[in-house]
Amino acid sequence: MPLLKLVFLGTGGAVPRADRMLPAIYLEDWLGHRILLDAGEGVQYRLFQIGVAPSSLTLVAVTHMHEDHVLGLPGLVITAKFLGGKVKLLGPRSAHGILSRLGVDVADGYDGGRLRVRCVEVCHTVDACGWLLEWDVGYKLDLKKVEGLPKWALTKLIRGEEVEVGGRVIRPEEVADPAHKRYRRLLYTGDTGPCPRMLKTVGEVDVLIHEATFADDVDPNKAHEEGHSTVADAVEAAKALRAGVLVLTHISARYTDKARHRQLAGRVPPPPHVYVPDDFDTLLVQL
């Protein structure tokens, strides 16, 4: 079953609070990939607190080079090396030079077979990547169309491979259930204001993790000038992307709690289902 585990290690932005650390999200999928999205200050300690060794990470993907998103990297990289691992780092191309000084491999995308990760340009004040994660969950077959086929053929068809049975070549598209989506997608925006080009590039997602630095008490134009979003901006993006799940994070330290964000989120009729997590909250999402 395609299942994602998301642990929100840091849900703040720019300045930490005692109960709200800087941006970092741990993602674990049903295939065994372990991915860290952004690396706020002290993130390695938070990983240890949830029982995850830095050396076990498949990828660390940072959205941009503002300090609140990357100050946890040096310690994370060093500890991973001490533990016998090596961090695979993703970041914007403009940051590859400085990131490579950490002694790690740096790229702007990842292809792990059934999981692909790529950079999507967002609208911030510096060069920044949103990270689009796409899983190939295979085909769901139309039982009437595959009746009588051997099990080995069914297995290959589900994986997306064509087969030859009795001299007939069968392509998975020919016998698939048209109502089933082969790919599942998650977008993590990092810092961004409203971004039409991001929406156009991405198309649709199942899960959207979108910054909501501000609730509704700040002039939206001011927020956008700073390269940030309000709750309303994030909801609008989720609807445009037809997301089933929207997670709001990167909450400004100006808010002593997230009550207003949650009030606004609670007014949104699903879809999307809107969540405003606290630090260390875990969200399980079935794709």
Swiss-Prot record:
* Catalytic residue list: D68
* EC identifiers of the protein: 3.1.26.11
Instruction: List residues binding Zn(2+) 1.
Output: H64, H66, H124, D191
SUPFAM superfamilies of this UniProt entry? Answer: Metallo-hydrolase/oxidoreductase (SSF56281)
Question: What's its catalytic activity?
Answer: Endonucleolytic cleavage of RNA, removing extra 3' nucleotides from tRNA precursor, generating 3' termini of tRNAs. A 3'-hydroxy group is left at the tRNA terminus and a 5'-phosphoryl group is left at the trailer molecule
Q: Which UniProt keywords apply?
A: Endonuclease, Hydrolase, Metal-binding, Nuclease, tRNA processing, Zinc
Its cofactor is: Zn(2+)
Q: Which GO terms describe its molecular function?
A: 3'-tRNA processing endoribonuclease activity; zinc ion binding
An example of a Pfam family matching this protein is Lactamase_B_2
Q: How does the cofactor attach, per the note? A: Binds 2 Zn(2+) ions.
The highest taxon in the source lineage is Archaea
In this chain, Zn(2+) 2 is annotated as bound at D68, H69, D191, H250
* Reported function: Zinc phosphodiesterase, which displays some tRNA 3'-processing endonuclease activity. Probably involved in tRNA maturation, by removing a 3'-trailer from precursor tRNA.
Q: What family does the database annotate?
A: Belongs to the RNase Z family.
> What does the record note on quaternary structure?
Homodimer.
Name the HAMAP family on file.
RNase_Z_BN
Q: What is this protein called?
A: Ribonuclease Z
**What is the gene called?**
rnz
